[in-house]
Amino acid sequence: MRTHPSCKAFFTHLICFVSALVLLPQAAAGAQPPPVDVGLITKLSGEATYWNETSQKTPKPAQVFMKIRKGDHLKMGSGAALEIVYFQGGRKEAWQGPAVIIAEETGSRAESESTSKGQVTVAMLPSEASQGLRRIPALLEQARLGRSGGIQVRGPEEGVKKTVVPGKKGQTEIARAREAYQRWRAQTSPEDVTPELNLLGTLAEYQQYAEMEKVVQNALERQPDNEALKELEQWVQGKLGKAKQ
């Protein structure tokens, strides 16, 4: 008995449909979104690496001003020092190595109890701190992408960016960021540039390049060897037409 061609086509499509239903959940499971960003490394000295069982299984060197994701493992060598600010709740942690910690939504936990004794100092930052700090990794990435070989690069359409006048919402947010900076700066050690970073993140959101230049230079006075801040300064100066050729 021969099967009619239309029946063969029907069964072929049916098999493909069933196979797709079986494979679709597996494909979705294999395409999980990356873990959420939960914090920012604001200070780092010595050797430290990070990895994540979900998205970054191979350890890589940690960097200052690098964002931290939920589930990140951070391993600090002997003598290493690392500070993290968590966006939710404004928790600031200062860790001393050797230690291995795991980042959670509002803070870190030591991988083992033996590394948690006398290894961390905790402070709580102003509630306004998280908004500006969240923008810092993207801002620094812009600065790096806008430079090549240490020379400011501009596309033909960019030209000089003048500081713009923000709308009412922007003016309110900038005013709050300035007030938070003044309070925060008075309570922070001189070499800590976290208050400057928070203000820079807000100013960048509204293209306040002239004020950004002053804030970056202030931060560089506190950390003159910080290469990320040097890159950011040249990027801002490029926006103002002051790039060194």
Give the location of each predicted region.
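Alpha-helical linker/edge segments of TPR/alpha-solenoid repeat scaffolds
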Residues: V236-Q245
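Structural register within alpha-helical repeat arrays
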Residues: N198-L203, E233
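TPR-repeat structural position
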Residues: Y209-A210
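Bacterial N-terminal signal peptides
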Residues: T12-P25
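Alpha-helical solenoid scaffolds that mediate protein-protein interactions
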Residues: A180, W184, T202, N218-L220
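Flexible, surface-exposed loop/linker segments and immediately adjacent secondary-structure boundaries
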Residues: A31-S189, E196
